[in-house]
Amino acid sequence: MSITPDRRQELIGEYANKANDTGSPEVQVALLTERIVNLTEHLKTHAKDFHSRRGLLMLVGRRRRLLDYVKRQDVKRYEALIGRLGLRR
């Protein structure tokens, strides 16, 4: 259910703006998206896992706030990010 360290490093390398960039909004959104996808798959087989469902909703809300921040800062960066992640919006 969690992201493996190798996958985490792969995502950080792919979405980082510069070397050793782990805190930029793009990296955070990419990591949250990976966790959301994993939790969504988990909930498809465990439909009554309401604790995980609440965690999923919290992750989606956190990702939404980060995306809103990126959109306020730079609309082109926002559009590029949602395009790379394949998010609707």
Curated annotation (Swiss-Prot):
GO terms for biological process: translation. Transmembrane segments: none annotated. The keyword Transferase does not apply. GO terms for cellular component: cytosolic small ribosomal subunit. InterPro entries: Ribosomal_uS15, Ribosomal_uS15_bac-type, uS15_NS1_RNA-bd_sf. SUPFAM superfamilies: S15/NS1 RNA-binding domain. Pfam families: Ribosomal_S15. It comes from the Bacteria. GO terms for molecular function: rRNA binding; structural constituent of ribosome. Keywords: Ribonucleoprotein, Ribosomal protein, RNA-binding, rRNA-binding. Belongs to the universal ribosomal protein uS15 family. Part of the 30S ribosomal subunit. Forms a bridge to the 50S subunit in the 70S ribosome, contacting the 23S rRNA. One of the primary rRNA binding proteins, it binds directly to 16S rRNA where it helps nucleate assembly of the platform of the 30S subunit by binding and bridging several RNA helices of the 16S rRNA. Forms an intersubunit bridge (bridge B4) with the 23S rRNA of the 50S subunit in the ribosome. PANTHER family: RIBOSOMAL PROTEIN S15, BACTERIAL AND ORGANELLAR (PTHR23321), SMALL RIBOSOMAL SUBUNIT PROTEIN US15M (PTHR23321:SF26). This is Small ribosomal subunit protein uS15. It comes from Acidiphilium cryptum (strain JF-5).
